[in-house]
Design a protein with these regions (language model features):
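Conserved beta-strand termini and adjacent loop/short-helix elements that scaffold enzyme active sites
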Residues: 55, 311-313, 357
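Hydrophobic or amphipathic alpha-helical targeting/insertion segments
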Residues: 40-87
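Active-site core of glycosidic bond-cleaving carbohydrate-active enzymes
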Residues: 350-358
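Surface-exposed amphipathic alpha-helices with a cationic face
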Residues: 26, 42-49, 294-307, 348-350
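Hydrophobic anchor at the start of a short beta-strand
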Residues: 52, 308-309, 354
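Polysaccharide-binding and catalytic clefts of secreted carbohydrate-active enzymes
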Residues: 75-332, 339
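Catalytic domains of carbohydrate-active enzymes, especially glycoside hydrolases
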Residues: 2-4, 9-55, 194-211, 326-336, ...
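Short low-complexity, flexible loop/linker segments enriched in glycine and/or proline
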Residues: 46-50, 67-71, 223-225, 322-329, ...
């Protein structure tokens, strides 16, 4: 099918635009028609003789399961706005300044074991007996006047970030989508069965585009519209964290990570900063986990006679195409959203049979 005028081109389509979709496919020489985030293809398109390419975000669009099992949702470490003490007692609401629709405090006993309170002026960790927590607020005792204090804490991420961006930017009104953590055994079992069912119910699909895998790049929204994006980092690992991940890491490496390994005096572990030895260990730990789980998904897709492509953006953290484990996953194609020649090269040099640029 490939020639100078046809092939190697994927055209987005949408139900309701059948005539336009098929006319453009013919005019531009498309060999594949795909859906997009929030769109569907009608039978008129899927039965028109083109390869069909369907988009799946494996960790979202499972809101009913997330409501029934909220403990399977993803998390992150956050830190409160530093508060200057003016007396011996100081009160901090950890989530003040964050977007309330994105985060909820994880104040379970398991999570509280990882909370920390810091005197940032003296750069010292307060002992647990120096503070208490109740009803969404932390109360510090024996403060030093005019020292600045902050709380590092675990929070549930209750709105998947790409869906959140599309809602707030494009004024979507559909239900907010949540995200599951495949590290939770219940979520992982559910996701595998969901993918098998999806493959059975969509025999017309030739290629499944995973958008992407499990953990999104860090994108933290604030409550102030003038400072909506508090922090974003395309390659940060902060959104992979959970008590389960921290425990598994400690069992394997023989030492424990703390909130401060991620918060880093409020500077966070941004990609442009040289990684610490702890961060290097944690990155390798996450990459192996992601590769192992992704390989299982690819095997499921292949078992139904379909190809598995992956989008090199969004929930891509841990699957680095130039990392040690990417080629072991077995993807049939890599897709990259391109803004420059540098990103073209990022996609083109990866070890995978098909390279697709958006």
């Amino acid at each position: 099918m490939n020639s100078y005028t046809k092939g190697g081109f994927t055209l987005p389509g949408e139900a309701g635009y059948e005539k336009l979709t098929l006319e453009m496919a013919e005019k531009w020489g498309a060999d594949v028609i795909r859906d997009s985030d929030g769109t569907k293809l009608s039978p008129e398109i899927t039965e028109a003789g083109y390869k069909i390419y369907s988009t799946i975000c494996i960790i979202r669009e499972h809101n009913e399961f997330a409501r029934q099992h909220p403990e399977t949702q993803q998390q992150t470490f956050l830190f409160s706005e530093p508060r200057t003490a003016t007396g011996e007692t100081t009160e901090i609401r950890p989530l003040d300044g964050y977007f309330a629709e994105q985060f909820a405090l994880n104040d379970s006993a398991e999570a509280m074991a990882y909370w920390q309170v810091w005197d940032r002026t003296a750069d010292c960790l307060l002992p647990p007996e120096a503070w208490t927590y109740a009803e969404g607020r932390v109360t510090l005792r024996h403060c030093i006047p005019y020292h600045r204090y902050s709380v590092s804490f675990l929070a549930w991420r209750i709105w998947e970030e790409i869906n959140m961006y599309n809602h707030t930017t494009n004024h979507w009104t559909s239900e907010h989508l949540r995200q599951l953590d495949p590290r939770h055994p219940l979520a992982w079992e559910y996701l595998q069965e969901w993918l098998k069912r999806w493959c059975r119910e969509n025999p017309q699909t030739n290629v499944i585009r995973l958008t992407s895998l499990f953990y999104n790049f860090v994108w933290i929204f604030g409550s102030d519209l003038r400072r909506r994006t508090r922090f974003t980092d395309w390659a940060s690992y902060d959104f992979t964290v959970s008590p389960a991940a921290l425990k598994a890491f400690e069992q394997e490496y023989g030492y424990a990570l703390t909130a401060e390994d991620f918060i880093n005096r409020g500077r966070l572990q941004a990609t442009h900063r040289p990684p610490t030895a702890h961060k290097r260990d944690y990155m390798d730990f996450i990459q192996r986990f992601v590769a192992d789980k992704a390989r299982t998904l690819v095997d499921i897709i292949h078992s139904f006679g379909k190809e598995a492509y992956v989008f090199y953006d969004d929930s891509w953290v841990g699957m680095e195409p130039y990392g040690k484990y990417f080629s072991s996953i077995g993807f049939d194609g890599l897709i990259k959203c391109v803004f420059s020649g540098f990103e073209c090269r990022l996609c083109a040099g990866a070890e995978v049979p098909v390279h697709e640029l958006l």
